[in-house]
């Protein structure tokens, strides 16, 4: 991660120690923007200016800096890593892979993406599905890399795709319908089932 940190500054807002101090579970949240399909990663519920500043450093017309309106962000997946260091490493890895795709590997990635007749990233209105697809590929990559059991809670199992395409250390479940509306309740509910024994979330 040193290359990313040097180029972009501090990636994570929370360290393993601060997450434990604040009673936060070892989660990584994967949010999708309802209008554009863009994805933001967070360590606690909700998308903030910090996340947008770090994860959309050099926006362009195909990948504009998304709005921070909370009603437009929905949790696509919540990954429980069961270990705060693993969760922080996974978060850093997700942001780093995004950075590599949009900077160092930009030309190569462009050739892999579905494009329209003009050679631009395919879209339906403002929505570009490629961003959620790439986010899921990156989540699979970091899940395998951390080498600890991971439970991924999905907004819908069809987003996960085929279970056999995921690493062996990944288990899967489905979020409840109201989790997208009440993110703080989502954190508390999932924390009760979290993998780290003896750790619970602090009361909000």
Swiss-Prot record:
<keyword id="KW-0804">Transcription</keyword>
<keyword id="KW-0687">Ribonucleoprotein</keyword>
<dbReference type="GO" id="GO:0000150">
    <property type="term" value="F:DNA strand exchange activity"/>
</dbReference>
<dbReference type="GO" id="GO:1990904">
    <property type="term" value="C:ribonucleoprotein complex"/>
</dbReference>
<keyword id="KW-0805">Transcription regulation</keyword>
<dbReference type="InterPro" id="IPR024629">
    <property type="entry name" value="Ribosomal_mL67"/>
</dbReference>
<comment type="similarity">
    <text>Belongs to the mitochondrion-specific ribosomal protein mL67 family.</text>
</comment>
<dbReference type="GO" id="GO:0005739">
    <property type="term" value="C:mitochondrion"/>
</dbReference>
<dbReference type="Pfam" id="PF12829">
    <property type="entry name" value="Mhr1"/>
</dbReference>
<protein>
    <recommendedName>
        <fullName>Large ribosomal subunit protein mL67</fullName>
    </recommendedName>
</protein>
<dbReference type="GO" id="GO:0005634">
    <property type="term" value="C:nucleus"/>
</dbReference>
<keyword id="KW-0539">Nucleus</keyword>
<dbReference type="GO" id="GO:0005840">
    <property type="term" value="C:ribosome"/>
</dbReference>
<keyword id="KW-0689">Ribosomal protein</keyword>
<dbReference type="GO" id="GO:0003735">
    <property type="term" value="F:structural constituent of ribosome"/>
</dbReference>
<comment type="function">
    <text>Transcription factor involved in regulation of RNA polymerase II-dependent transcription. Also involved in regulation of mitochondrial DNA recombination, maintenance and repair, and generation of homoplasmic cells.</text>
</comment>
<dbReference type="GO" id="GO:0003697">
    <property type="term" value="F:single-stranded DNA binding"/>
</dbReference>
<dbReference type="GO" id="GO:0000002">
    <property type="term" value="P:mitochondrial genome maintenance"/>
</dbReference>
<keyword id="KW-0496">Mitochondrion</keyword>
